[in-house]
Amino acid sequence: VFHPEVDFDDRIDHKLRAEDLPIRVPSDKYERNIRAIRLLHQLEDENRLATESEQKLLADYSGWGGLSDRFDENHSDYEELKTILNPEEYTPARESTLTAFYTPPVVIEAMYKALENMGFSRGNILEPSCGVGNFIGFLPESMSDSKVYGVELDSLSGRMAQQLYQKQNITVGGFEETLFPDSFFDVAIGNVP
């Protein structure tokens, strides 16, 4: 459990709306990512969970897909990236520029609608490659009694998800390293790369 010292009732799960995730131009995406990373590092330095208003800033993080030019040493943002991202964050971020694209809200909502049509309303939900947790943030009210378990290999994205979805169980690491019991999940949902 992330920050076990914090009571469950004092935790906040961020709720996403489609308008919270517009398509952004690269410069805007970059600036929002940097703000979110600075805030994440501050929260970690202060050893605390994000407030509701801070979660809105963290939710602006959208990964590095489409931003490969920012990692070019001739780009004006290169030095800032090298300064803000520690070595354990920098290399995976650079390597993800061709693969880190998060699922659009319309797809997430359609997948949940399909689950509703199949009669699913509550249970243990697995999101095996959760990124920053967009599937968790779009969990419909009709499924709000469910418990979501997210797994994310990318440390930066997984740590963002832990701050955004404080009531859920987010594992930062490889799925093969998890210790979930057999037959524990009622449904798995996601858009694994």
Describe every region a protein language model picked out:
Residues F2-P193:
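Class I S-adenosyl-L-methionine-dependent methyltransferase catalytic core
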